[in-house]
Amino acid sequence: PCVIEAEEKAYAFDMLYVFVGQDFENQNELCGELSFTIAGHEYVTDKTCMILVPKNTPHGPIRVNRVDQPFFTYCGGASKERVPESRDRWVMPEGEFRFEKYVLHGNGEDNNEAEQEVLRLHGSDNKIIGDFGGVFYGKFRWFRVTTPKDFIFAAESHSHGQPELLNFYSTDPDDPYNLGATISMEMMGERYEFDQTTTVFAPANQPHCPLKIMSVERPFMFFTLMPDCKVYSLDK
């Protein structure tokens, strides 16, 4: 198997792991098999999923047991550095261990000819967000080749009370830096245009957008991440 994380580790911040298949007709299929261990319990799945690990919770190894076709994987955490905690600071889950407290499968909404939402973390009513106290806000979606030219995804300039990452990722494993699309986005009123795999960082309270998908030659992954979704705000 392909080993993503060989050893059991824990971190002083919440971690987010995302695994998304590229079968656009069956968005919940990973097209491979994943093994993910949390607090000594192994979870094996062949489905698109998002795994949230609370701070100081030991996890790993993480392995890809099988790949039927390329799939997308991403990890992030609420910290500037990724330094493992010493074992004396590890915290084991209390009570009965249930994977559904940590794993979220495909739950996208609002699919249309332009975009296909696959996963979302949005709002304190989500069982994972409720357990962890609102660690992340995020949406993961594909933009299709059927996206109309000059498709306006976000029409107005706005800001948030939290920093935001806006990520545009290629789906071609042999050409990962070529986005296969052209994007136009404004930051503080200044317009940028790019056609490469790109991460845009919008600091808290900094105006950003409009965001326009100018053209799409092949599907690409777009996802946003912000900390602390319970205080998510949208300020014009």
Where are the regions that the model predicts?
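Intrinsically disordered, low-complexity linker/propeptide segments enriched in Ser/Thr/Gly/Pro
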Residues: 1, 16-17, 72-76, 166, ...
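Short Gly/Pro-enriched loop/turn and capping motifs at secondary-structure junctions
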Residues: 23-25, 58-60, 80-81, 172-174, ...
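Conserved metal-binding segment of the jelly-roll/cupin
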Residues: 41-65, 187-214
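A short, N-terminal "cap"/entry segment at the start of jelly-roll beta-barrel domains
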Residues: 1-6, 86-155
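Residues at beta-strand starts and edge strands
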Residues: 14, 32, 69-70, 163, ...
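Double-stranded beta-helix
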Residues: 62-112, 211-236
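Conserved short histidine dyad/triad with adjacent acidic residue
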Residues: 1-24, 139-171
